Design a protein with these regions (language model features):
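Walker A/P-loop NTP-binding motif
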Residues: 32-33, 52-65, 82-87
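Signature of the SF2 helicase/ATPase Hel1-core->accessory helical subdomain module
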Residues: 61, 77, 82-85, 163-164, ...
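Conserved RecA-like P-loop NTPase helicase motor core
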Residues: 416-426, 471, 476-580
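Conserved helicase motor "Helicase C" RecA-like lobe of SF1/SF2 P-loop NTPases
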Residues: 451-475
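A substrate-engagement module of RecA-like helicase motors
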Residues: 1-14, 47, 64-190, 283-286
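Conserved pre-motif I regulatory segment
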Residues: 1-43
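A contiguous, basic/glycine-rich beta-loop/short-helix subdomain that forms a polymer-engagement track
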Residues: 157-190, 205-207, 304-419, 426-433, ...
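Conserved RecA-like ASCE P-loop NTPase motor core of nucleic-acid helicases/translocases
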Residues: 66-72, 372-374, 444-451, 575-576
């Protein structure tokens, strides 16, 4: 493998524009060693290292069966269509690679047979159904990702099934099942690409979902704790209860059995009563206690429904088990303690473990295959101790390789001198004025990452009409469509929050200014964050130093990483939060970021961009 990453090596011969990077070769060597010795590895690779090829090449060279688990579908597609073919060509390996997704991503032939399109409303779903007709006749995979016009969640739910609704071998369409076909192909593959959620479902199922494998690479590993918490937690939602009732009615019709109308009505009424009893005014609200009486009544109603369905045939037996599983989720919300947190949402009741480390240690790290964790942000401070502690990964080597980019030449960090405290009422308005001024200096070409949806709305209202650039806003179009427009319309501005802090890759001039309004501390009152801070205190730690600060540092590094995506990129990161300068922990944030010049005068930004004329705020 030594010559693959060198000048004139296999990758240079495969990719005409390949640039050898010592950091990529070092990362590949560390991964090769881990695979050879069967050791877990936590590897941080700075932006631009080319981490995908750095793990794919040693994975293919090892001859082992490897699973790659990602957090996003975009990375799955990139691996399948771009990176794996390059790695295979460079290593001379004839590799069988398959992407495997959860069942709900595949068309269900049985659901399709019973679908009644005349019930579709006019508009988007009607158009989506019409557009699907040719695809239904020609698709070989049934994968929703093939569709050019995205159906709504409600429409796709009518045409697909999750694992809790699948009849398995009892289904008359089992031999032609798209999901089973995908699993069969994955069982024969050398390399299987999945997402974090499906890998954790594999662990939860007693290793029954994926083929046996020697190693797993967790790419985008900075998101593993949240993925694991979601897997280990549960929820009871208004939509889920309605879906259960819908499936019961449909299965009864198909089996020519009487619909248990009384039991279904009671589940609907008691579910609605519980959800209304805990509903927050907005967002998420932590529940120190779930009202026991409405919860117990809903559990009883679900038990009665399960009893009414039991023994009525295989499909109704499956729905009986699903009803009991829903009752178990409600019961879990009642059993709160130091290790579990529950919260309410406008349409759901949810719970999650506060700490996933013990479960991951026992079920994955101690008993599972060799694990390689890769991300651009796994160290908070000098090492990956924080992330390893959160994940329960006690025995693992660490590798840290920096970015090949020249940040002192390519980037400028701007922290304005006179911003108010971010917790004050005047901050959002002052930040909006600063954003408008900066957009004048950068000629648009900006991504603005906000701390909340409220701030997003305020900046949208303030910026539109004050700058001569197209202003794109998260929520006004699907994520990928927004990113496509942002890349194509070079002087456009994208305002976003939440998921846009990571996984956004916009090389070139379209992203020349990155604005971050506040240091990304979790919002006060976030149930899971609050419970984790309390758990740290109970264990004798300091909630801020040992959890809140390193978590925010990792998030800020993710946001910063959106700016420089290539050797030719140049740009400014503007962080409008004065705490970066005024609080002692500001030095920790600055030390965590790539080294580059820091300025507090907008004249430095103007000079960086070539003295463009500012737009009046």
């Amino acid at each position: 493998m030594e010559d693959v990453f060198t000048a004139g090596g296999a990758l240079s011969r495969t990719l005409p524009d390949y640039e050898p990077r010592p950091e990529q070769a070092a990362l590949a060597a560390a991964i090769d060693r881990a695979l050879s010795l069967g050791e877990h590895l936590v590897a941080e690779a700075g932006t631009g290292v080319g981490k995908s090829l750095a793990y794919l090449v040693p994975a293919l060279e090892s001859g082992q069966r490897v699973v790659v688990a990602t957090a996003t579908k975009a990375l799955q597609q990139q691996l399948l269509t771009k990176d794996v073919p390059v790695a295979a060509a460079a290593t001379g390996r004839d590799v069988d690679v398959q992407v495997l997704k959860g069942r709900a991503n595949y068309l269900c032939r049985r659901q399709l047979q019973g679908f009644q399109p005349f019930l579709l409303p006019d508009g988007r779903d009607g158009a989506a159904w019409e557009a699907m007709q040719g695809w239904l006749d020609t698709t070989e995979t049934g994968d929703r990702a093939e569709l050019e016009l995205e159906p709504s969640a409600a429409l796709w739910a009518e045409l697909s099934v999750g694992p809790d609704r699948c009849s398995g071998r009892r289904c008359p369409f089992f031999s032609a099942c798209f999901a089973e076909g995908a699993r069969a192909r994955a069982a024969e593959a050398d390399l299987v690409i999945v997402n974090h959620a499906l890998y954790f479902a594999h662990v939860a199922s007693g290793l029954a979902v994926l083929p046996e494998h020697d190693a797993v690479v967790f790419d985008e590993a900075h998101r593993l704790e949240e993925s694991a918490a979601s897997w280990l937690g549960g929820r009871v939602s208004r939509q889920g209860l309605r879906r259960l009732a819908h499936d019961v009615e449909r299965a009864c019709r198909e089996a020519q059995r009487p619909v248990p109308a009384r039991e279904l009505d009671r589940v609907e009424r008691t579910g609605e009563r519980l959800l209304r009893a805990v509903a927050p005014p907005a967002g998420r609200r932590r529940l120190r206690e779930v009202p026991p009486e409405p919860a117990l009544v809903l559990m009883d109603a679900l038990g009665d429904l399960a009893a009414a369905l039991h023994g009525q045939g295989e499909d109704l037996d499956a729905l009986s088990r699903r009803s009991l599983a829903a009752a178990t989720e409600v019961e879990a919300c009642l059993e709160l303690g130091p290790g579990r947190v529950a919260w309410s949402e406008p349409d759901a009741l949810a719970w999650a473990p506060v700490d996933v480390s013990a479960e991951l240690r026992e079920r994955l790290w101690d008993e599972g295959p060799t694990a390689i964790l890769v991300s651009a942000t796994l160290t908070a401070g000098d090492d990956a101790a924080f992330v390893r502690r959160r994940l329960g990964l006690d025995r693992a080597r660490e590798a840290v390789v920096g970015s090949p980019y020249d940040f002192p030449e390519q980037a400028l960090l701007y922290v304005p001198r006179t911003m108010p405290d971010p917790r004050s009422d005047g901050f959002t308005g002052r930040a909006a004025d600063e954003i408008v001024s900066l957009l004048g200096l950068s000629a648009g070409r900006a991504l603005v990452l906000t701390s909340s949806y409220r701030a997003l709305d305020a900046y949208r209202d303030h910026v539109r009409g004050r700058v001569p650039y197209e202003v794109l806003v998260q929520g006004e179009a699907p994520r990928e469509r927004l990113l496509e427009r942002f890349r194509a319309e070079v002087d456009s501005v994208l305002l976003a929050t939440s998921t846009f802090w990571q996984g956004v890759d916009v090389p070139g001039e379209s992203l020349s200014l990155l604005v971050i309004d506040k240091l990304p501390f979790s919002a006060p009152g976030d149930p899971l964050h609050e419970a984790r801070c309390e758990a740290v205190e109970l264990q004798g730690g300091d909630w801020f130093r040992d959890y809140a600060l390193p978590t925010a540092m990792l998030q800020l590094r993710q946001g910063f990483g959106r700016l420089i995506r290539g050797h030719a990129d140049r740009g400014v990161v503007a962080i409008l939060d004065p705490r970066l300068r005024t609080r002692p922990y500001g030095r920790a944030f600055l030390a965590a970021l790539p080294r580059c010049p820091v300025a507090e005068d907008p004249a430095a930004v103007a000079a960086f961009f070539g003295d463009r004329v500012a737009v009046s705020a």
